[in-house]
């Protein structure tokens, strides 16, 4: 075969490679006696030897076509291409027949044979590429022009030939999907090729990049004329119509070849010429499913608007619900708070956000105009039924922020009084320089918080392990002077459910006075100790042995203590005070008061102090004598003065006043020395609280306990009263009985015993 050329054609690299891998063609070329062997042998150095024009042999043409086809496949491995591709022509030649040189007069028949040539990959690995960029450009332009001219002349009559299919499809069809050992026929590619041929346009140029050659891709790019650029675009569109998967496979199968593309078009597996004068829309491939250039700007605009809308809405003081309500009244489209929230968070679809944006923008402009314009005319128009702006007129109430120091002061006030009056709230507000309404709301919220933290239970002190709730409407003791002189006495007998010892049973202690009618209200016990409960059946002041009880027992290395508590409903309460009956039987109180965490031998001390509502850690042990106990009672009054002559009873050895804050005088003692009445109802103070009784030389036996009765009148407040009772009988089993009666008519009896080792 012979190809016309108007320039020098460097061919040694291709020809030598073809001979190396195709011995038959090498022998054919050597047997041809046309005198071209000198050209072939002298073509080693392109700088010194020139190839004569029109002296290309069939082997050279085959190698050239094979090389071009390798370029069109865009980077298939050269070694694999050499093994899988071949150039076959339609010439009927014998194996041993020499190939004659094709003369210029035989060019029409050669051109007729070129379109029928099935282009397979020919030649082996191409080595020794020493072409200059100018020589490469001339070579490729010449070969492409000749092949295209032959294809244009014979495309009309041979549309279904394999050559046309190969020329059009080899540029974009990967080897992984269409085997090149068979003719390739693609109808769509043929139509595109026919259009290109009718317009006499150049096909896209493809350049091979050798894996071993580290040359920049720019040296292989051939500049084109404006006519060729249009053909390049159409050929590029032809590539994009092939399946996308095939191109992906092509990329995966060709990792060793790097090819470039023009910046305006998506990356291809081929090198394309930059086209700068053409608009982007023409170079954008049709197959790529990317959004248009306007859509990203719309997304950014929507995102920016959503952010701005939220900021301006908050600045104007509207909630998301207000916006949805106002838009429904203004524009007839009701939107929920969730919709507005999703719009601000960009959680809606692009289409819905585009629909919602103009409405929100209009509402925002109207809201800002209303805020800035204070004229009554505009307000009346917007507030008309047709322009309902109730949603716009609603403003979010500013959240009140209270400083730390003010909050601490309010907490102190709350501890003193949880329900202050209006005058007290006004005073607190003036002191803290706060609004009265803010203070009132704070106290209301604080009371609700207190209910959540400490829900109302069945009464009693939170520090006590035993809580009791009692109710009765009958008075316990008459608040008259006949309390002491009355000859009628009722005996309250307490028998423990679990007897401590045979000699420790407490039989009775007298309470002189008058009582009212009986009540059958039953005590309710909430206890952390294991309860032993039963129903109270006795309607009198003498509870049955099966009364509601709770027992706790603690043992240490030095002694064993048992506390037994019974709760008994009393039929006659005092006005608002408490009644406590106490006796001896307590030892090592100083050890007990050192801390609530440890349980000493006199475990009854902690139980009695808790039953009295007092924390044992309030006073230091150094203030008490050995074996002392501390109890607390609310101040109160009986309303009448008792005889001071009873103070000279022999059962009292020492009375000491250790506190000066407030007073709760001991106004009377009964003749037996078992009952002490405390009164703060306007009588002269005899002693101030707390009281310390030091009965070391007294007859405070287990069956005859000393007692303290404290009664408080309604509305009377005062300091805490303390009773300090000591005993020296530490070597015998002691029993102590406590009875605490509140104004509601309930009595809690605590029986404790401690045994010293």
From Swiss-Prot:
CDD domains, A to Z: homeodomain (cd00086)
Record has Transcription as a keyword: yes
Pfam families per record: Homeodomain (PF00046), Pou (PF00157), POU2F1_C (PF19536)
Gene Ontology MF annotations: DNA-binding transcription factor activity, RNA polymerase II-specific; sequence-specific DNA binding
Every POU-specific domain range: 294-368
Superkingdom field: Eukaryota
A single Gene Ontology CC term: transcription regulator complex
Keywords per UniProt: Activator, Cytoplasm, Developmental protein, DNA-binding, Homeobox, Nucleus, Transcription, Transcription regulation
InterPro entries: HD, Homeobox_CS, Homeodomain-like_sf, Lambda_DNA-bd_dom_sf, POU, POU2F1_C, POU_dom, POU_domain_TF
DNA-binding region: 395-454
Subcellular location: Cytoplasm; Nucleus
Any one of the GO BP annotations: regulation of apoptotic process
Region of interest: Disordered: 1-43, 271-295, 375-398, 532-574
Polar residues composition-biased segments: 19-43, 275-285
Family: Belongs to the POU transcription factor family. Class-2 subfamily.
Domain notes: The POU domain controls nuclear translocation.
Function, as annotated: Transcription factor that binds to the octamer motif (5'-ATTTGCAT-3') and activates the promoters of the genes for some small nuclear RNAs (snRNA) and histone H2B. Acts downstream of Notch signaling during radial glia formation. Regulates apoptosis, possibly via an FGF-signaling pathway.
Entry protein name: POU domain, class 2, transcription factor 1
Native source species: Xenopus tropicalis (Western clawed frog)
């Amino acid at each position: 075969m012979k190809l016309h050329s108007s320039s020098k054609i460097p061919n040694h690299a291709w020809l030598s490679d073809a001979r190396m891998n195709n011995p038959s063609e090498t022998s054919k070329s050597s047997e041809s006696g046309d005198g071209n062997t000198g050209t072939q042998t002298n073509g080693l150095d392109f700088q010194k030897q020139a190839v004569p024009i029109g002296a290309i042999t069939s082997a050279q043409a085959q190698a050239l076509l094979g090389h071009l086809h390798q370029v069109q496949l865009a980077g298939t491995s050269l070694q694999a291409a050499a093994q899988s591709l071949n150039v076959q022509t339609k010439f009927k030649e014998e194996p041993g027949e020499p190939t004659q040189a094709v003369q210029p007069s035989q060019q029409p028949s050669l051109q007729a044979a070129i379109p029928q040539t099935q282009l397979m990959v020919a030649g082996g690995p191409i080595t020794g590429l020493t072409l200059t960029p100018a020589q490469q450009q001339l070579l490729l332009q010449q070969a492409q022009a000749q092949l295209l001219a032959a294809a244009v002349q014979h495309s009309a009559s041979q549309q279904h030939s394999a050559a046309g299919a190969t020329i059009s499809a080899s540029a974009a069809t990967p080897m992984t999907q269409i085997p090149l050992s068979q003719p390739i026929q693609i109808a769509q590619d043929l139509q595109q090729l026919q259009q290109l041929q009718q317009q006499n346009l150049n096909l896209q140029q493809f350049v091979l990049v050798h894996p071993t050659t580290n040359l920049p891709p720019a040296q292989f790019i051939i500049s084109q004329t404006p006519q060729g650029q249009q053909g390049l675009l159409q050929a590029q569109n032809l590539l994009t119509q092939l399946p996308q998967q095939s191109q992906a496979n092509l990329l995966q199968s060709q990792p060793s070849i790097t090819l470039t593309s023009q910046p305006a078009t998506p990356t291809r597996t081929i090198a394309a010429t930059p086209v700068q004068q053409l608009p982007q829309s023409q170079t954008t491939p049709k197959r790529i499913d990317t959004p248009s250039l306007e859509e990203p700007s719309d997304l950014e605009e929507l995102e920016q608007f959503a952010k701005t809308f939220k900021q301006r809405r908050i600045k104007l003081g509207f909630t998301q619900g207000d916006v949805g309500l106002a838009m429904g009244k203004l524009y007839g489209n009701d939107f929920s708070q969730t919709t507005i929230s999703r719009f601000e968070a960009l959680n809606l679809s692009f289409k819905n956000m585009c629909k919602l944006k103009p409405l929100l923008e209009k509402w925002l402009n109207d809201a800002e105009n209303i805020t800035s314009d204070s004229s009554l005319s505009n307000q009346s128009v917007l507030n008309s039924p047709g322009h309902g702006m109730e949603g716009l007129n609603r403003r979010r109430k500013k959240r009140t922020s209270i400083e730390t120091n003010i909050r601490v002061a309010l907490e102190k006030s709350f501890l003193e009084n949880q329900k202050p009056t209006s005058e007290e709230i006004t005073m607190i507000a003036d002191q803290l320089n706060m609004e009265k309404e803010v203070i009132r709301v704070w106290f209301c919220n604080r009371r609700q918080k207190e209910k959540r933290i400490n829900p109302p239970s069945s009464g009693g002190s939170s520090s006590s392990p035993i809580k009791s709730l009692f109710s009765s409407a009958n008075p316990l003791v008459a608040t008259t002077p006949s309390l002491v002189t009355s000859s009628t006495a009722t005996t309250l007998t307490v028998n423990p459910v679990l007897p401590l010892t045979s000699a420790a049973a407490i039989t009775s202690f007298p309470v002189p006075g008058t009582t009212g009618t009986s009540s059958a209200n039953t005590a309710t016990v909430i206890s952390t100790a294991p309860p032993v409960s039963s129903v109270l059946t006795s309607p009198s002041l003498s509870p049955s042995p099966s009364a509601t009880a709770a027992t706790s027992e603690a043992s240490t290395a030095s002694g064993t203590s048992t506390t037994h508590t019974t709760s008994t409903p009393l039929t006659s309460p005092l006005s608002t005070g408490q009644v406590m009956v106490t006796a001896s039987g307590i030892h090592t109180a100083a050890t007990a008061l050192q801390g609530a965490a440890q349980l000493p031998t006199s475990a009854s001390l902690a139980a009695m102090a808790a039953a009295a509502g007092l924390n044992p850690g309030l006073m230091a042990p150094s203030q008490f004598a050995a074996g002392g106990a501390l109890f607390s009672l609310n101040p109160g009054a009986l309303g009448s003065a008792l005889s001071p002559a009873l103070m000279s009873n022999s059962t009292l050895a020492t009375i000491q006043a250790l506190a000066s804050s407030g007073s709760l005088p001991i106004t009377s003692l009964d003749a037996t020395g078992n009952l002490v009445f405390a009164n703060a109802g306007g009588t002269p103070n005899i002693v101030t609280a707390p009281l310390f009784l030091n009965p070391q030389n007294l007859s405070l036996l287990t069956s005859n306990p000393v007692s303290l009765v404290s009664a408080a009148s309604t509305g009377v407040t005062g300091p805490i009263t303390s009773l300090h009772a000591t005993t020296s009988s530490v070597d015998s089993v002691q029993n102590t009985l406590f009875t605490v009666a509140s104004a509601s008519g309930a009595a809690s009896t605590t029986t404790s015993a401690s045994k010293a080792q």
